[in-house]
């Protein structure tokens, strides 16, 4: 049963991040930035979330004195995962070096200023659509490809970038993993690979294949994720690369980007602002959701415990909900109402056409993972934490 996790954990560590580029000012040297940067780490609920994942019963020894490289380090999943590993280093002596890849130096400085002087964290400015040639890194033990265009507006405004990040970007990361003799490669895939429910199942298991109309703009994201999974299997067969595939469902949490245009993110932003929640459909969509802490725990479980070549759904039915009910929960929390609005053509072009996408998480639970935050608790924590940063 999912529940709202409680802990008395706090962290007093106050360090910071070295940059793989000469001449970049540390975040502590930038007036007005450090206060914003430190707010998240000063939040008790956020540090409880980090501690919950840090304390998972996982074979952490596989990461001890090793190195981990991940793309999308400043994204919702990536930034949370970076915090978990670096706190694990500090508290439990994991001594895992993290190489974080991301396009925005400024975003990384604002997000990871706490680790500015930590030799076990290196941020590398990088666009995954370009080959990653870094001979100075030596052997990299684990590689995670998390970078992706993950919200609807990007699907319609940058359809080329959406596809190339998921295919060319993935290939660049796979090549890097092969060249640097990585022990394991994890490709963060998506619930969207399942397409539309044919009406024959209640939950998607990992072998399910639903309908996707490939001759549409919106098909770029799910089809490129499908292609990415096949590309991983090709590298496993031809290059001998050990790969695993965590399939993320609709993830939310306090590390979400304010630019995110997914429905749940829009609802949460309205909740933070204390405004009415805007629903741009009848709200009949029935989806799986997952709080970011549980999603990252799932990614780490797949990375450290998953069987080579296998895909795993990161989902729990206690967080499955219809979109209209999700909107109502957030509105009720803030004493507001749900109002209906017709989306413009650009917005509508990026929306998923799937009306029912519930994932079966049994395969991942068999590895020992379980969800700790149900949808009500996760939403409450997200809004509370993000409000504290205002």
Language-model features, listed with the residues they occupy:
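Conserved C-terminal active-site "lid" loop/helix of NAD(P)H-dependent oxidoreductases
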Residues: 292, 324, 347-370
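N-terminal Rossmann/SDR dinucleotide-binding element
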Residues: 34-142
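Conserved Rossmann-fold NAD(P)-dependent oxidoreductase catalytic core, especially the SDR/UDP-sugar
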Residues: 172-220
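Glycine/proline-rich active-site loop of Rossmann-fold NAD(P)-dependent oxidoreductases
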Residues: 198, 226, 251-266, 275, ...
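Glycine-rich NAD(P)-binding loop of the Rossmann-fold in SDR/ketoreductase-type enzymes
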Residues: 161-169, 215, 219, 223-224
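Conserved beta-loop-beta element that borders a ligand/cofactor-binding pocket
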Residues: 190, 229-254, 265
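Mid/C-terminal beta-alpha module of Rossmann-like enzyme folds, strongest
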Residues: 305-348
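NAD(P)H-binding glycine-rich loop region in Rossmannoid oxidoreductase-like domains
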Residues: 125-165
